């Protein structure tokens, strides 16, 4: 029986479509009718072959603000021994000296030491590869800087341990109140200590105990922040109560309202500023509606801080 198939004895049969039809050949045009190209080349006709430029350092231009300049001292390839400070002037910072420095000072000193260490490491590497040895002056300076850096870490570790121990100690409310009362009576209310020194101590105290930063924008309003402004408000009243009758009158009872506390908290640490704050507090007490409820303390103080930040930014913009 015959079967239909794509194959036959003569070979495969291919289906023809309109796409498989051979295209008719185009007639060959005479040369005079061929259109010349509209563009002869994609390159500029003004290019000329010049001599190659040898790669030298004079052909390189490095910007003055390039970060790798931090690995050079005054843009010198390598310093001589005369460029280094004399050995009699080289000594590391001692731990007692570093204990008097603030965190920002220690931070800056650390990175200055790190930058100088990078410069010395590069120069020592060059000396080993070019000269084959190192100079004692470079090694002595590097060791001194290294000693300063580990002593900075020692001081920071001391502060971290002291901070952790104090946080654990202040978790006990009775011990916390006893500590604050002792500190206030012995230092903050001591008339033998000048007001400017007490103000400087209070700046560090409020940050360590209550987390209140001197920079307004860095503060987070929480329960500890509320307790801090109330404590500082009453402390200012007790400090300057003998300088003015109005301050003495307001200080008869502790300040408990957060609105009144915020007025005293934002006042300067001087009798005249505290007196002006007491005048504002007396005006607030004329209406009982001005008292801030306990449940509204956090949102109210957040609103006060936003207004204070806005006023400060406007003042800086117009200055």
Curated annotation (Swiss-Prot):
User: Which of UniProt's keywords are assigned here?
Assistant: Mitochondrion, Ribonucleoprotein, Ribosomal protein, Transit peptide
Q: Where in the cell is it found?
A: Mitochondrion
Q: Where is the transit peptide?
A: 1-14
Which cellular component, as a GO term, is one annotated location?
mitochondrion
One GO biological-process annotation of the entry reads: mitochondrial translation
Q: Cross-referenced Pfam families, in alphabetical order?
A: MRP-L47 (PF06984)
Q: Where is this region: Disordered?
A: 1-55
Q: Give any extra note attached to this record.
A: Present with 7700 molecules/cell in log phase SD medium.
Name of the protein described by the UniProt record: Large ribosomal subunit protein uL29m
Give the species. Answer: Saccharomyces cerevisiae (strain ATCC 204508 / S288c)
Q: Which gene encodes it?
A: MRPL4
